[in-house]
Amino acid sequence: MEADFVILSLTPILIGCFAAMACALPGNFLMLRRQAMLGDAISHVVLPGIVVAFLFTGSASTWAMMLGAGAAAMVSVLLIEGIRRLAGVEPGAAMGVTFTTMFALGVLLLEGSGAGAVHLDVEHALYGNLESLIWLDATGWESLVDPVALAGLPPELGRMAAVFALIAIAGFIFWRPLVLATFDEGFARTLGLPVQAISLGLVAAAAMACVAAFTAVGSIL
């Protein structure tokens, strides 16, 4: 029973926990800034970028997905700003139009490009593939100290743990300016804090967490 838990359940639980914590750290600040919808937007707009990156490189590597997601995020920012100015609508409405359009485009690309027949498909892109991230080389708890067994861990575990650690360390280092810029932007500006750079860094952290968690929990979750 213990061996079955280590093989089948331990790594999916750990990956899910790291994904939840990595997304929650920037997500809480986005909520406090009344930008909770931005988290939804980021997780949706990265989908077409990830699909296009996969089609160009033929690889589902982290760096290719990061570049594709970053490009999609920049396009989305331009679209949101363009819609807001040209149509004269509120930023929230422009954001809603943009992220639903980008998400639909990503699903269409998945269905029409043939990527689903290789490594990407709609179901896994939307809901992830957490149940398949098992540790086949494990024999029990003793495998946690076995270098050979540890080499067979799903790469998503190390990737998600590294992203969580990076975001947590950055949050610890920049905690004071981040809190000041979140709760009193005017006061933060008078102190000479780079408020705009802090906001961009927060969005970048959220995007990084979304891309890292994409394989495990998908675009929606």
PLM feature segments, named:
Residues N28-S43, L47-L120:
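Short loop segments and helix-boundary regions at transmembrane helix junctions
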Residues L8-P12, S61-M65, I167, C210:
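Short alpha-helical transmembrane interface motifs in multi-pass membrane proteins
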Residues F103-A170:
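Transmembrane helix-bundle core of multi-pass membrane transporters
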Residues M1-A22:
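Membrane-interfacial amphipathic/re-entrant helices at transmembrane-helix boundaries
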Residues A151-L221:
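Helix-loop-helix "hairpin" substructures at the membrane interface of multi-pass membrane proteins
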Residues L79, V97, V122, F183, ...:
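General structural feature for long, well-ordered alpha-helical segments within catalytic domains
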Residues I13-F18, M66-A71, A93-V97, L157-A162, ...:
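Hydrophobic alpha-helical transmembrane segments
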Residues C17, M21-L25, A71-L78, L105, ...:
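Generic alpha-helical transmembrane segments of integral inner-membrane proteins
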